[in-house]
Amino acid sequence: HWTVRIANEDGKNSAWAEPAMWTYAGLASNKDWQARWITHNASSPWLRQTVELQAVPAKAYIYINSFGYFQLFINGKRVGADEFTPHVSQLNKRTLYLTYDVTEHLTEGKNAIGLWLGQGWSGATDTRGWQAMPSPAVRAQLEVANATGQIATLVTDDSWRAGESCLAYSGRWKWNKFGGEV
């Protein structure tokens, strides 16, 4: 929590403002991740998990870290408007992650969380033919706070369902290819 007050040019202080708090700080280091990396042997897989919540969350954030592109869906609706996310990463040094406030997307009861993955930069090759990863991979960590402040953490693990999407290729510097006949 934090608060502020203002001093005017005569040195007179205002009253303290109402206490406030940072909404979230994110995951500061690799040790903060409880999620496991998951993938499916396809260039553009769909990954899905159902989670059941006892009540509508007071706050909920999801952190997503991926090799390759991803799009997040909750209860059939896309979260965020980003395309080809995350942006360019130097995969031998770091991977970028994004945080979404998903409070408004979750409901009491069953919630379907879906992740579409695309090859993107995970399929990058160098001049010697080295490839970063044969298939895109992701780890996601959903932190849900109830009205009393208790936090439940839901993570990617081997219980997620996986399947191949109709997108045949989504890589760097090439147009997407859609295989609608599948």
Regions found by a protein language model. Give the residues of each.
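Accessory beta-strand-rich segments of carbohydrate-active enzymes
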Residues: 1-3, 8-10, 21-28, 47-182
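Short Trp-Ser/Thr-centered turn/loop motifs at beta-strand boundaries
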Residues: 13-19
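N-terminal pre-domain segments of enzymes
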Residues: 23-40
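N-terminal flexible segment immediately upstream of the FAD-binding catalytic core
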Residues: 43-44
